[in-house]
Amino acid sequence: MTGVSIKFDNPEAYDQWMGVLTKIVGDRFLTWLQPNTSKHWIDIGCGNGASTEQILEKCSPSVIDALDPSEDQIKFAKSRKLTKLANFSIGDAEALTALDEKYDYAVMALVLFFLPNPERGVSEMVRVCRSGGQVAAYVWDILGCGLPTNPTLKVLEARGVPFSIPPSSEISTVNALRTVFEKSGAKLVETTAFRAERIYASYEDYWDLSFKSIFVSPAVKNLDLKLIEEIKTEVKENLNIDQPGRVKAKAHANAVKGTVP
């Protein structure tokens, strides 16, 4: 369902509701890449800098350039402790300003499904990577109900409340990721999936953070308070809540990597 725009204008809130799960998936993604140290990286669509920080922490790059179209996100990214070593800029994933064959690794973390033209984005990744370099990406499996906020979105959909998902959500399947990478000219293309869980201390904790998400917040912020409470109650009924009242939230992402010929 669409009808509400997705905006990245609150990086602090994004980090609160998404940070734990993206840290888990991001670490597994970088381990899967098995990168060499002291290499040149570009983090395309770096958002609030979480992925850039993970690359710096786990991969010891000699150079890392990071770009995002949101000034708010870039400002927040620069405030992270480790990201002082990164080169941040405002940029378009489908029209990179980098020279051809500049990097050893080009990555997109939770980005491809937000691009109007994912094929163009992947082609740009391949263009800026050296021969033998690696291009890679991961996305929440939206069509496979992999979004962390999926329990809430299901209730909104059932009630006819408009909300938006990324515009190119069809790219989130394993087959679609493999196809777009192979069409870009990448070789030795591989795919995998990562699952992650987060434990919330209570349902109130879960709801408060979900309410801040870029998918839920725009859809419910202007609703009648009575309707919001009804949605809140219905979501709770569909969650895995243990005896102490903790909520176990699950998400899963699909990933792809390939080598530049």
Question: Residues of each region from the PLM?
Answer:
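Conserved alpha-helix/loop element of class I SAM-dependent methyltransferases that forms part
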Residues: 20-39, 54
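A structural alpha-helix within SAM-dependent methyltransferase catalytic domains
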Residues: 30, 53-56, 122-126, 153
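Class I SAM-dependent methyltransferase SAM/SAH-binding core
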Residues: 40-96, 120
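Conserved catalytic/acceptor-binding region of the Class I
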Residues: 119-120, 126, 130-201, 217-220
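Class I SAM-dependent methyltransferase Rossmann-like catalytic core
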Residues: 5-20
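A short SAM/SAH-binding and catalytic strip from SAM-dependent methyltransferases
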Residues: 105-118, 141
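Conserved Class I S-adenosyl-L-methionine
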Residues: 3, 22, 48-50, 169-261
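A short acidic, Gly/Pro-enriched loop at the edge of an enzyme's catalytic core
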Residues: 94-106
